Amino acid sequence: MDRIAITGGAQLNGIIPVSGAKNSAIKLMAASLLTDQPLRLTNMPRLADTKFLGKLLTRLGAQVDEREGLDGSETVLHAAEITSGFAPYDLVRQMRASFNVLGPLIARTGQAKVSLPGGCTIGARPVDLHLQALEALGAKIDLHEGYVYAQAPRGLKGAEITFPFVSVGATEHAMLAAVLADGVTHIHNAACEPELLDLQICLNAMGAKVEGAGTPTITITGVAKLHGATHSVIPDRIEMGTYAVAAAMAGGEVQLTRARPELIDSLLVKLEEAGAGVVRTEDGVIIKRDGTRLNAVDVETQPYPGFATDLQAQFMALMTTAKGESRIRETIFENRFMHAPELMRLGADISVSGGEAIVRGVDRLEGAEVMATDLRASVSLVIAGLVARGETTVSRIYHLDRGFERLEEKLGACGAQVRRIKGDAEGGPDHD
């Protein structure tokens, strides 16, 4: 398996262009199943996860054409005919979000057989809410031997859907299914993440009638048919936040371009509170820090627009060398401090109890061999390695390749001493 080696001590100075959002791109790709006309997605990230979903869409009958356009990478998806409604375990297990093809398949063809996603390394993330939403829309759902058998021979019907708790994936899934339902659907207690607004913009460009994405109530008036469209994927706020933290950690001055800093306001406020310089620009944000040591600050993960759980691991890495004691509370997912023991291998002083971690800043981290446990944890180890004395080697970096496009290249262009060490072919475990 490949590894990444980081030699600590170099400041970061330069420009990093932010890629399109992975968490938006994979749902937009699933939306291509809703029409028999081409959907052209620009500002597309080139990641392992988008490749996994492309393979699944191809299995279902879609044509997936990746190309380079004037605005960077783009993907054209054309599901002129759904030749199969079967999404097998060997593909769905590779990425949980691929389960979201279920709704579009039912909406367009009236039937589907989709594997349950399987296990997840970040605690319990059941798909019960997804299935309940589809049942509310009139789908008949049966579970048998690890597969979801879904039917709606007379089509889906508009419905009132109220989620008992906020779920980004379930909200997106309900939107994808309801756009072709007969009648009006109201989604209550909907997730408010910006990726949902991005999905709404794309669906409406395809002829859907969706209102309210980004608020707790989404209204969808079903239409009989969708058409093709061109849509630019929203910038990746998690990648943006990750490089912002990396710049604050290593010191120097990094300009993030093709970015929307308002999407990570909750993080930028904490960086300023810790003592980093934050300058918002027309095209993004500049993060800078001189040799002054950062101050410890507390964070608590919350649904958007609160502090993102997907930035918690990165921020913990930042706090390992801050002055004082930081309390980090994780309220979104259980078992999401698996990066803490690996950071401790680098010399971090961290205590974990339930959903809270206490980070006591140390003067210096020491390079060591560490292992990535999931996507965000893996990049937190790279961030810590930027300041650790000596060399830090991160293994199991297939996690990184799922969510960060050209990470070594982007950091290296700013002066980081980071390189990929090629290994044997990677299988990798099931992905979340």
UniProtKB/Swiss-Prot annotation:
The modification 2-(S-cysteinyl)pyruvic acid O-phosphothioketal is found at residue 120. One of its GO terms (biological process) is regulation of cell shape. Phosphoenolpyruvate binds at residues 22-23. Its main location: cytoplasm. It is an enzyme of class 2 (transferase). GO terms for molecular function: UDP-N-acetylglucosamine 1-carboxyvinyltransferase activity. GO terms for cellular component: cytoplasm. Keywords: Cell cycle, Cell division, Cell shape, Cell wall biogenesis/degradation, Cytoplasm, Peptidoglycan synthesis, Pyruvate, Transferase. It catalyses: phosphoenolpyruvate + UDP-N-acetyl-alpha-D-glucosamine = UDP-N-acetyl-3-O-(1-carboxyvinyl)-alpha-D-glucosamine + phosphate. UDP-N-acetyl-alpha-D-glucosamine binds at residues 96, 125-129, 310, 332. It holds the Pfam family EPSP_synthase. InterPro entries: Enolpyruvate_Tfrase_dom, Enolpyruvate_Tfrase_sf, MurA_subfamily, RNA3'P_cycl/enolpyr_Trfase_a/b, UDP_GlcNAc_COvinyl_MurA. The keyword Amino-acid biosynthesis does not apply. Pathway: Cell wall biogenesis; peptidoglycan biosynthesis. It is found in: Cytoplasm. CDD domains: UdpNAET. Its EC number is 2.5.1.7. The active site is at residue 120. Cell wall formation. Adds enolpyruvyl to UDP-N-acetylglucosamine. HAMAP family: MurA. Belongs to the EPSP synthase family. MurA subfamily. This is UDP-N-acetylglucosamine 1-carboxyvinyltransferase. It comes from Caulobacter sp. (strain K31). The gene is murA.
